[in-house]
Design a protein with these regions (language model features):
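Beta-strand/loop subdomains of soluble extracytoplasmic proteins
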Residues: 134-138, 143-153, 184-188, 199-220
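Active-site substrate-binding loop(s) of clan PA
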Residues: 80-81, 130-131, 152-155, 167-201
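Short, surface-exposed secondary-structure boundary micro-motifs
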Residues: 123-125, 193, 262
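Catalytic-histidine neighborhood of serine endopeptidases
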Residues: 108, 115-159, 184, 271-273
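Bacterial N-terminal signal peptides
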Residues: 6-16
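A conserved glycine-rich beta-strand in the N-terminal activation segment of trypsin-fold
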Residues: 73-79, 89, 95-123, 149-150, ...
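C-terminal cap/linker of serine protease catalytic domains
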Residues: 22-61, 198, 256-326
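Active-site region of chymotrypsin-like
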Residues: 87-104, 164-175, 199-300
Length: 326
């Protein structure tokens, strides 16, 4: 794969040949997690990890200028696309000390390299989610080989779109380009870690492009009577589940068109309406569009975001009960 990096800007034929000769990738989830925990605890003993609490304090709306990879025109077959995504997709999550057994565990979500220089894109809630019973946790990223990279800092974030950039030390990892403007009906692919089943590859279609607003929160995390600005989302039929937050949704050229955010079970009864039986549930998968990720490269994002709330409407929000894809 190191040779492949030098060929990506050369002949399309050579790229396909190099990928075709790749060995089949086989993941052992137990070995993968054991390696992360062993490496993570060793790094902790040497003072190389940042606590989740310290990183959580850095998650505020801010942008950072980045040099992004150019949009790709290279077409990949699905197996080759999976290989390409695995070079840039990470397991991102917390190494935590279990309050029940006292052992260390790794709780994985996802992220992907978005810019050369070790910049990883993931969801804000991957960092912000808290378990009151866990007293000690540290944020890590791991590639498909199980190599562990401590998350050093939060470079940029937009809590409204639930998207952030974090810094690791892995300059050799290849970034995925962003692509805006995808339409409903286009085919997309996802590489994620649903339920701890790492590096699962799925495909589907963009079923809808939509905008959604949510209740705006004040500095104490309470609703303040306003709605957020409208956030651009894609609904996709490519399957993912909790454990997939932050995973890339890409086109056939490995351009990131969105990032996994949350899942809604359409068809559930209205909360508090226990008299009606739930209708058959259909998972509706929400992914934050690449346009929202691109906003994080605006160094003036904090000022712009302050002007984008509007008076809260009186109508109910459409949709069912949402849960994070984490």
């Amino acid at each position: 794969m190191h040779k492949l990096a030098a060929l990506l800007f050369g002949s399309t034929l050579f790229v396909h040949c190099a990928l075709a000769q790749s060995q089949r990738f086989i993941i052992d989830d137990d070995e993968f997690l054991d390696k992360i925990v062993a490496t993570g605890t060793s790094l902790l003993k040497h003072g190389k990890l940042q606590s989740v609490d310290s990183l959580r304090a850095q998650v505020r709306t801010k942008g950072v200028p980045l040099k992004l990879a150019p949009t790709s025109q290279q077409k990949f077959s699905p197996p080759d696309l999976c290989d390409r995504l695995r070079e840039s997709t990470l397991a991102v999550g917390s190494l935590y000390k279990c309050p029940d057994c006292g052992e260390w565990h790794f709780n994985s979500s996802a992220g992907f390299v978005v810019a050369q220089g070790s910049v990883v894109c993931t969801c804000c809630h991957v960092i912000l989610a808290q378990d009151e019973n866990v007293q000690e946790s540290y944020l890590l990223a791991a590639d498909a080989t199980g190599h562990v990279y401590p998350v050093q800092s939060v470079l940029a974030a937009d809590t409204v779109s639930d998207t952030c950039f974090v810094k690791i030390d892995a300059p050799h990892l290849k970034p995925l380009p962003l692509r805006v403007g995808i339409r409903a009906g286009e085919r997309v692919y996802c590489l994620s870690h649903p339920g701890g089943y790492h590096f699962m590859f799925t495909e589907g279609l963009v079923s809808r492009v939509n905008r959604r607003r949510d209740d705006a929160l004040d500095s104490d995390g309470q609703t303040n009577g306003f709605l957020t600005r409208p956030i651009l989302f894609l609904n996709v039929t490519a399957e993912f589940a909790p454990g997939s937050s932050g995973a890339p949704i890409v086109d056939e050229s490995a351009n990131v068109v969105a990032q996994v955010s949350s899942i809604t079970d359409a068809g559930e009864p209205t909360p508090g309406d226990e008299n009606n039986s739930p209708s058959p549930s259909v998972p509706v998968r929400f992914c934050t569009a690449a346009e929202e990720i691109l906003r994080l490269t605006d160094p003036n994002l904090e000022k712009a975001a302050a002007l984008e709330t509007r008076a809260k409407s009186k109508g109910p929000h459409p949709g069912g009960k949402s849960k994070n894809g984490r």
